[in-house]
Amino acid sequence: MTDLSDIRREYAKGGLRRADLPQNPMDLFALWMTQARDAELSDPTAMCVATVDEQGQPFQRIVLLKRFDDTGFVFFTNLGSRKAQQIAANNKVSLHFPWHPLERQVSVLGEAQALSTTEVLKYFMTRPKDSQIAAWVSQQSSKLSARQVLEGKFFEMKAKFAKGDVPLPSFWGGYLVRPKSIEFWQGGEHRLHDRFIYTLDNTQWIIDRLAP
């Protein structure tokens, strides 16, 4: 077994205090997202989306956040993907934003709700054309005999859609994750990290400090 126990560092970029927290967690999330973007972090919108299968086995993957507001967090995916199939059976999911250079993490528990075709199309039309074509090509999570199969399909579809707009695939969609709880983690000195969790109680957010 490889021993990694000596890899550590102190966290000293700042603290998080109850008096500084807004009542709405999405306001704090918006601030932290802005600061992550201003710091020019690589992929600040990247989040880990966790789902479970029918046996309770968890699965995780990195997905890009595309929109957020007071209602929740939006991402898009192939509806035939493993994540979409698992959401169809159990829409309870978790999201995790790892902003390591800022010594911050945000963890979200919530329920995924399918977006309307109108909402999906609105976003789909903003994607670069090659990305739109790629959505037609990949049967996400299916097995491939070789990469050349995928590339061949891509160039075939690229020729097919050379003129005009690329239509929205019926098997491509998106989700709004409505949060039930949001935890904010700020690294602290001597491993005394600051953790605050917002928990939704009907229409009110309850704020609690958690031990690190």
UniProtKB/Swiss-Prot annotation:
* Binding residues annotated for substrate, in chain numbering: R8, R9, E10, Y11, K66, Y123, R127, S131, R191, L192, H193
For biological process, the GO terms are: pyridoxine biosynthetic process
Instruction: Give me the comment on cofactor binding.
Output: Binds 1 FMN per subunit.
What quaternary structure, including any partners, is listed in this protein's UniProt entry? Homodimer.
Which HAMAP family does the record associate with it? PdxH
Please explain the role this protein plays, according to its UniProt record.
Answer: Catalyzes the oxidation of either pyridoxine 5'-phosphate (PNP) or pyridoxamine 5'-phosphate (PMP) into pyridoxal 5'-phosphate (PLP).
Protein name (database record): Pyridoxine/pyridoxamine 5'-phosphate oxidase
